[in-house]
């Protein structure tokens, strides 16, 4: 028995900082034998330090789960939350004195469970008001600090005495650049010591420079756009006269005006007549006369025309440039319709008269010498309008007395009368003269019929307009028009006009 006691004493020896006391003579409150009774259970209770177990007298405590238990102690109400749980092996052991061991501590059995007592929320009294919670103050930056980071789209808070200057500093980049540009010239002028007027000029100069640069850029952008269509226009203008071979610039302008006055059906016929203009309009210069004579000599074997074909086309550019009123056009159309009717009627009776008309034309054409050709051209360029009108009247009146009576039919006699005031008769005469050089039956007569066209330049502008428009529709029925009566007029009028021209030319050098 001593050995185990000695082992027990050694096992529960007094620690170095404690002193051993003998047990009290009084009986303990509980002993190990009292805890082992059938009506008692051992529970481990955990409670706060100020907990008074008297407040739970007569209260039910849950042995499983959690529950709020109300207690009252010394006139005060207390609320506690009680949590119960099952015991775990080896969690805790109880030492209790035993009478059998002489008052020594012995280990007791394990507890049935654990109870945790926690302080619950205290109930507020009905009369006591709730304490208001103060709102937290907004965050502020200390006065000595300056924020460097600014979020995108946000403005930094402004604090301290520099709040008045902050809006001026937070400006856009454009305003900052303008301020830098304007401040630089002001400082330079302040050093030089100039007046306030120069300062104003310096302030305005950078703005003006910026505006000028913008204007220049806009002009440069506009110039290539404008250069595109403008560059194409002269090319179109130059292409038009290349096909016509015009030597002078004045005729280039007159040509489109003439085209606008006439119908599109007459374009093909006009081009054939205008192509001969550059050879015939160069009458004033002596160098161009030679070129003109060479061009006409090449045409002689085909048509039998030397220089006399030139005055026929000389009138055309002036006629094309002058627009006509609608009333005159109507009269001309009526005259053209009248021209076609007598022309068709004269087809049958005139055909047998072709031979007698050729003899006077053939005899009169070669009478003019070659030396008189350039003189006749120079004489026509110099005299006035009055002399031309007189020549025209004389040239038209005289041939009527010679041959018109026996040879011409009744329909064509009034065409040779120049003194008549009616315009239809004049249209008929000029219409016949245009169709003559195209006829292939008589190569000599087209040259003879051209002096009539030579006499026309002296006529008024109205006659020129009428002759030009009458030529275009009349060229289509050339095959239907009778050859001999037209050639008869040209054969009769040509020799009389040439005789008078020769007399005038012979008198001038004397």
Swiss-Prot record:
PTM sites of type N-acetylmethionine: 1
A Gene Ontology molecular function term of the record: RNA binding
Biased composition (Basic residues): 421-430
Modified residues (Phosphothreonine): 287
Sites of Phosphotyrosine modification: 80
Residue numbers bearing the Phosphoserine modification: 27, 128, 136, 172, 205, 285, 309, 490
GO biological process assignments: cell surface receptor protein tyrosine kinase signaling pathway; rRNA transcription; transcription initiation at RNA polymerase I promoter
Subcellular compartments: Nucleus, Nucleolus; Chromosome
Similarity comment: family membership: Belongs to the eukaryotic RPA34 RNA polymerase subunit family.
Record protein name field: DNA-directed RNA polymerase I subunit RPA34
Organism: Homo sapiens
Classification lineage: Eukaryota, Metazoa, Chordata, Craniata, Vertebrata
